[in-house]
Amino acid sequence: MSLDLNSATGMFLGLAIGDAMGSPIEFEKPRPRDNYIRRYQSGGFHSVSKGEFTDDTSMALAMADALIESQKTNGYPFDGHMIMNNFLDWRYNGKFSPREKCFDVGLTVNGALWKYKEDKTTPFTGCTHYKSAGNGGLMRLAPVLIVAKNKAEAIYLARESTRLTHGAEEALMYSEIFAEEVWDGCILPQYVDYRHPLDIDRDDVSSGGYVKETFQAAW
């Protein structure tokens, strides 16, 4: 996105902070407007400590590390095998995790990593069944959006990075849409109060792992 260092850092920190603030209330129903989360909490499904991030940030860190190494080695940031090997290092060795072990992994991601661990012929091992359209690929998009040089590349990298672990067309589509919307938002000359056509009433927003629900909640 040709971002300066401060902007790129802000995007990545925003991912990690949102992850850490949201993880204690993961899978809960929407809260009343006067009961928003305004500071770090502990607890939740994974018994996180205050400020502790989860698999979403860990996988984004793993991807960012691979993008940097691929740029140095290959002259181009995206290398699916490098990314997947980093994902394996996180899953089985705890690298990139705040606890030095993997304590949170989705079923779709876990299946894709196990498949790649057994056969590294291709890095794109995400399940293509429509019921596997989880949000894992969408949640870790920041690194590829930072390195993309234009909107077309941002959309392409969003799809390819998602396809590593999530092959369902719906999961790929929402990553592409999100990449395009973020890119368009970042190149606007000033802040725009933008409401996406997919906006729904906040009481109807769900907080499960389905990619469409996550997209709607974020937007």
Regions from the PLM with identified roles:
Residues M1-W219:
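Structured, active/binding-site neighborhoods that engage oxygen-rich ligands
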